[in-house]
Amino acid sequence: MNNNKKTAAIVSLYGNSNFGNKLQNYAVQEILKKEGLNTVNIVNIPCLNNKKVNNIEVLKLYIKGWLRYILKGDKIKDCVDPKDPKERKKNFLEFNKKIANSKHFFSFSRLQEFDKYDYYFVGSDQIWNPIYGGLSDLDLLTFTQKKKIAISASFGIEEIPLDYKGRVEQYISKFDAISVREEAAKNIIEKICLKNKFVNNRFALSLKRLKIILRSN
């Protein structure tokens, strides 16, 4: 890592079972490197739930999602890959080598230790889905006052539960720029009067727009 360059931290879903978020993570990293930044990937290790997350509300969302599948008659896809699971895991771990300089996050009590980078990027995939533990202090970057940018982020739900709305408004309003993956996420954020935060509503930032955001400090 070049110590003379500024550093961008990337917070994303980091599981070894989803091609989409893995490729997005890599793409964001490479875009930032081309812009002359060092990159750090903050890997969220499963730990105790954030105390601010209401588990009852999460359970309601989970049940609602399954009911939607049943009522629509959708088939729930088999989560087991038809190929050899060992080979699949091996391929993911091999690709992880391309996502360099990872810092492992273990505990919310040590969150302030990560407030040492110049820029923070969140996304993609359902990084703000409360069912998956989203809307935590890490995912909302509550611990830093540095520049914050969301790239192709998603809530994975059509409406934020009442218990979460204040939290979403308080912290997402502090982002310098936001792009989201689908229309539902765009609607959620616009309801809290953040239309001026959008750079686009579907895909990653253009390089031109990214340069403007990074250099406006």
Residue ranges and their predicted role:
Residues 47-48, 197-200, 210:
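Terminal amphipathic helices with adjacent charged low-complexity linkers/tails
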Residues 158-163, 205-217:
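Acidic anion/phosphate-binding donor-loop and adjacent secondary structure
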Residues 127, 184-185:
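Alpha-helix capping/helix-boundary segments
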Residues 7-19, 23-170:
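Aromatic- and Gly/Pro-rich donor/ligand-binding loops
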Residues 49-51, 158-159, 185-189, 208:
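Short, charged/polar "capping" segments at the starts of alpha-helices
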Residues 6-7, 217:
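Residues that mark the start of a beta-strand
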Residues 175-182:
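A short beta-strand/loop micro-motif in the catalytic core of glycosyltransferases
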Residues 186-205:
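Helix-loop-beta element that forms the nucleotide-linked donor phosphate-binding surface
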